[in-house]
From Swiss-Prot:
Homohexamer. The homohexamer is stabilized by ATP-binding. The homohexamer may adopt a ring conformation through which microtubules pass prior to being severed. Interacts with microtubules. It catalyses: n ATP + n H2O + a microtubule = n ADP + n phosphate + (n+1) alpha/beta tubulin heterodimers. Keywords: ATP-binding, Cytoplasm, Cytoskeleton, Isomerase, Microtubule, Nucleotide-binding. GO terms for cellular component: cytoplasm; microtubule; perinuclear region of cytoplasm. The lineage of its organism: Eukaryota, Metazoa, Ecdysozoa, Nematoda, Chromadorea. Belongs to the AAA ATPase family. Spastin subfamily. The keyword Cell division does not apply. It is found in: Cytoplasm, Cytoskeleton; Cytoplasm, Perinuclear region. It is an enzyme of class 5 (isomerase). Its EC number is 5.6.1.1. This is Probable spastin homolog Bm1_53365. Severs microtubules, probably in an ATP-dependent fashion. GO terms for molecular function: ATP binding; ATP hydrolysis activity; microtubule severing ATPase activity.
């Protein structure tokens, strides 16, 4: 029987892994869902699969009560649980909408398999599990180029650690910079640093040699991940490794740094490569006396690998980190990310453009004159991109709520009245900005002293 403290630690690790994995899957699902048209059944079904797996991980994490983890982590678990409950309902709503558009068919390969989540074992060491989810259909059939066969990518890499990392390779998709609304300064900086050097490498040498570490920071829900994907999409033959913090961690001493080493070796074998690490602050925060030996050794290995990458003129590698807490990153880590770009909430013009784009893209009928659009742009001050998407979804439901169940049953979508400014006003009572002004000012102050902003 496990000691109570070890059981509490095990419960927390199980919760945290499920939390991180659910967040990653749902974020990936939303990205695919939002950029694909309603006629793109293949991509919509991929998004559905992401949502289903995300829901299972949400439910797995929510089964663990805060009082079952060790005391110093209970407030964190409570906070995450509240957010997960909201996200779970939102994800179920998205999945339900897609299932109505694309009913399940017999003998489809995209049928979802139960999540095989492995709780960390305290009693005996096992091989580190880099990814505890089943491989999604999006990543299952990776189309490697001739130079990027599995054997070539794993050259000089322990398959035990490198094999699961290959599942993080994303196939090139059609996300482009032009698909992203707002964030003009960030897009321009990324184009100069990443995209243009691939067009004419000889021009970008010497003092014009691009940075190999970029930090995207800003409030959540403003497209940091989508920007990184757009960079990979614009670069054509570049391999894109989308690595979560959970994929780089292991509680067994010695394994975490081997995972980091394997990651960079795979990136070198398949270069040019972009390594994208979301929530980088969760694994590379400032070093202190209380951190574990595992964490300290992993950070040291990451620094060594970054130094090796920066000192080599032959390596065509780029590491992009994303965080909403840049001030918590270790100073030595920050030095490896000389390009630090604030991804702020959209301004009035970008907010209006995003709202109108969503309405038009989804073929949602609306009645908004020029003056009303300007009013709506002013009302939504402080809303993030994801907040605006949620607001549009809520506003689209208002006309339906005016109808009886009988009316809804016999109504076709084209007969539904258009969305008005009043509908958005009602929706704003339910959908509030997820980012407070205090957080924004803190991030902008950081950008003014240590980063780049508009």
């Amino acid at each position: 029987m496990l000691h109570p403290q070890k059981l509490e630690q095990q419960n927390y690790e199980t919760f945290n892994k499920a939390y991180l994995k659910s967040k990653q899957l749902v974020t990936e699902g939303v990205s695919i869902d939002e950029i694909s048209s309603n006629n793109d059944e293949q991509r919509k079904r991929i998004a559905m699969e992401k949502y289903r797996m995300g829901i299972e991980y949400f439910e797995k994490a929510l089964k663990i009560s805060p009082d079952k983890v060790y005391p110093e982590k209970r407030s964190e678990v409570i906070t995450h649980r509240e957010a997960m409950k909201r996200n779970l309902e939102a994800t179920k709503g998205r999945l339900s909408d897609l299932e109505k558009m694309f009913p399940s068919k017999g003998n489809r390969n995209l049928q979802h398999r139960p999540v095989q989540f492995v709780s960390p074992s305290i009693s005996k060491p096992q091989t580190a599990q880099l990814s505890s989810r089943p491989i999604s259909s999006e990543k299952k059939n990776i189309n490697y180029s001739n130079a990027r066969t599995r054997s070539n990518l794993l050259k000089g890499v322990d398959d035990k650690f490198g094999g699961p990392l290959l599942n993080e390779i994303l196939n090139q998709d059609d996300v482009k910079m032009s698909d992203i609304i707002g964030a003009e300064t960030a897009k321009r900086a990324l184009e100069e640093t990443v995209i243009l050097p691939t067009v004419n490498p000889s021009l970008f040498s010497g003092l014009r040699q691009p940075a190999q570490g970029i930090l995207l920071f800003g409030p959540p829900g403003n497209g940091k991940t989508l920007l990184a994907r757009a960079v990979a999409g614009e670069c054509g033959s570049t391999m894109f490794l989308n690595v979560s913090a959970a994929s780089l961690t292991s509680k067994w001493v010695g394994d975490a740094e081997k995972i980091v080493r394997a990651l960079f070796q795979i990136a070198r074998n398949g270069q040019p490569t972009i390594i994208f690490i979301d929530e980088i602050d969760s694994i590379l925060c400032e070093r202190n006396e209380k951190e574990t030996e595992v964490s300290r050794r992993m950070k040291t290995e990451f620094l060594i690998q970054m130094d090796g990458m920066l000192s080599s003129k032959d390596d065509r590698l780029l590491v992009i980190g994303a965080t909403n807490r840049p001030e918590e990153l270790d100073s030595a880590i920050l030095r490896r990310f000389p390009k630090r770009i604030l991804i702020d909430v959209p301004n009035a013009a970008a907010r209006l453009k995003l709202i109108m784009s969503l309405l038009e893209k989804t073929k949602t009928s609306f009645d908004l004159g020029l003056t009303q659009r300007q009013i709506l742009a002013e009302w939504t001050h402080g809303y993030s991109n994801s907040d605006l998407v949620a607001l549009c979804r809520e506003a689209a439901m208002v006309p339906i709520r005016d109808l009886s169940r009988k009316d809804i049953k016999n109504l076709v979508s084209t007969e539904l009245r258009p969305i008005t400014l009043r509908d958005f006003e009602i929706a704003m009572k339910a959908i509030k900005p997820s980012t407070n002004e205090r957080m924004l000012q803190k991030l902008r102050k950081y950008a003014a002293t240590a980063g780049q902003s508009d």
